[in-house]
């Protein structure tokens, strides 16, 4: 009978890679699902659910991501200023124009499980509004998710 082998932390860190994804023309939800699976390491043969075995991901052109249906006008994001009556509402169109990197980051974060491991995993996502990023030193591999 074969023994089950577990991935060690050192092996997971040693086998980490950097990937680059161009988000222009991609649907936000589909991009978030694929990104969450990549940073969790579900694409690897030695995936372990309780280990951080995923890769780093750089997402560029987040301002060109696509919201399907009427989400640009009918979906809203809320936040509060902590003052009385200080609730703020932002539409999808405004989120893409002003905070598209935050929109993509929060979509990926929402696709991860709610536990301590996900707080470590989300640090491996790097989102940029345009095609300029400061991660050239890591030599990322370009992924084509179109």
UniProtKB/Swiss-Prot annotation:
Top-level taxon: Bacteria
Listed name of the protein: Large ribosomal subunit protein uL13
Matches recorded under Gene3D superfamilies: Ribosomal protein L13
Gene name in the database record: rplM
Family: Belongs to the universal ribosomal protein uL13 family.
Purpose: This protein is one of the early assembly proteins of the 50S ribosomal subunit, although it is not seen to bind rRNA by itself. It is important during the early stages of 50S assembly.
HAMAP family, sorted: Ribosomal_uL13
Native species: Mycoplasma genitalium (strain ATCC 33530 / DSM 19775 / NCTC 10195 / G37) (Mycoplasmoides genitalium)
Family matches, as Pfam families: Ribosomal_L13 (PF00572)
GO biological process, one term: translation
Subunit structure comment from the entry: Part of the 50S ribosomal subunit.
Record has Ribosomal protein as a keyword: yes
Entries under NCBIfam families matching the protein: rplM_bact (TIGR01066)
